[in-house]
Amino acid sequence: MRKTNLQNPQLNLSDFQDKSLLILDDDDPLRGRLSRAMEKKGFIVKEAKSVADGLQIVKKSPPNFAVVDLRLEDGNGLDVIKELSKNKPESRIVMLTGYGNLPTAVAAVKAGAIDYIAKPADADDVEKALLADPNQKAAPPENPMSADRVKWEHIHLSLIHI
């Protein structure tokens, strides 16, 4: 599982007046566990298990934070990310995916996500990603010859050209 590695400390949830969080995932046990964990951390959680439900929540009351699965039974989580980014540009969105690869990461960021995390998602990693300071760049992995380093460099270069 990928962990967000920041050079400087993250923001605190108390820095945000709006603590609303949408968790969109069709995996009921994962969504339930993550929802409970994020509520304990202070987020006000709304759950959705389909693109249709997620879009309804985003249009009615756009959350400040969102954790969105990429592949859902009724469509693509990128549609929800795009709609939330349009309705609330300052929202902080993290994409969850069991299919972590470079094109997925780039598509998520282009749609408005600030990060992506491979499943199974750990609540601490999700919180770190949601609260990452937008003014700080993610540090590259420590092993300069690792596959993670190569992936990070490629993502970084790809994002420069967005």
Residue ranges of predicted features:
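Short amphipathic alpha-helix used as the core "switch/output" element in two-component signaling
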Residues: 56, 71, 78-89
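The feature encodes the CheY-like receiver
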Residues: 31, 73, 97, 101
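Active-site beta3 strand of CheY-like receiver
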Residues: 61-67, 72
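Conserved small/polar residues in nucleotide/adenosyl-binding loops
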Residues: 160-162
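Acidic catalytic/metal-coordinating carboxylates
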Residues: 50, 76-79
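C-terminal output helix
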Residues: 101-103, 120-130
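Short hydrophobic/Thr-rich beta-strand motif most characteristic of the beta2 strand and flanking loop
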Residues: 42-49, 57
